[in-house]
Amino acid sequence: MSVTKYSKPIRVFVHLAKGFDGRRWEKRWAAGQIIGINERLPYGYFRAAEDGCAVCYSEDKTKNKLEHLLGSLIMSIVGVDVLHAWRNRSRICTSDVVWTHTEIEYLAVLLLFRSLFWKRRPKLIAQNVWLFDRWQSFSGAGRFALSWLIAKADILTFLSLENLKAARSLFPNVRCEFVPFGINADEIPALMRKKAHRPLHVLSVGNDPHRDWPILIAAMRGLPDCYLKIASKKVKAKEIASCPNIELLNISSNDQFLAAFDWADILVVALKPNLHASGITVLQEAAVRGVPIVCTDTGGLRAYFSDEEIYYIPGNNPVEIQIAVMTLAADDELRFALAARAQERMKSGLLSSRCYARRHAELSRDLLAQETPSRAAELARKTAA
């Protein structure tokens, strides 16, 4: 990786979806209304200031009725919020590098670049989450249009090695990099040895579309000695109506969220096959809080945690969940060992938001360093003249 010293910070613009306005987020975070182990600003990108970046976030700007109608129309046609990017175009175009969190944002930025073709464009680090899971579902015309845009990204980044592999096969001429996701790991509570509750306290959390709730519910229905609490907007009360040992949580504050982890003996994350490391955020949150984890082995999660740190199971089989849950219920030492090793992994800092932001800073510096020789040559020519 090239490392170049700059006389001033790299100007970074983080373009996120509507609802992630930095100022509004910070107010909600301070009030404990951002659910999860989060940062004072979304995803901790601001931490790149420690690595020579001046970071600013996109703003949710008020739209009048006509703009709202236009934005909805464009969104229905192209599938991304171009108007949101347009309203942030000034700071996008005056930055050195634009960072995005998902394909929804970077595709909008690439469309903006195409529409402002006469303007200088900054570098773009384009992070992918769901796009390559869905790639085969797009029409030929859709894949062609996406490829036309993606070819103009400076770097495609991925939270999963599985996603990375798929992208490199489709876009061999575009630079693709694995950037491990990380959460705020500044405060990690001491891990306590404790006996399992009776009935066993089981927690499952998440809203990702690749959660396999039917399999988990089927597994827990057959385990009357376990009590499952689910924190998800994707599960309806009617789905658990016949399960007296399953409860839906209505979590409205971060204190309630953390209390659910403190209540749990184990966390279970049942997943459908995917490429994008579905579940990684909640796995890291559980590791920080010292909760042992059972998780489906899919999506490239082993790049984050090994089977020394997580009890991995095959997917699409409720019996495998039952075996894992009962194995951990009967073995206090195994639960403690898994939780301790996973927590040590988080303490290493390699899966922290600080490391995640630093990797973005390194990639940005590398992109800009590639321009330095030509800029220097141009300056030399002007000086000689």
Where do the language-model regions lie?
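Conserved acidic donor-binding segment of nucleotide-sugar-dependent glycosyltransferases
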Residues: N207, D307-P318, T327-E333
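Short acidic/histidine- and often glycine-rich active-site loop of Leloir-type glycosyltransferases
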Residues: E239-I240, T298-Y312
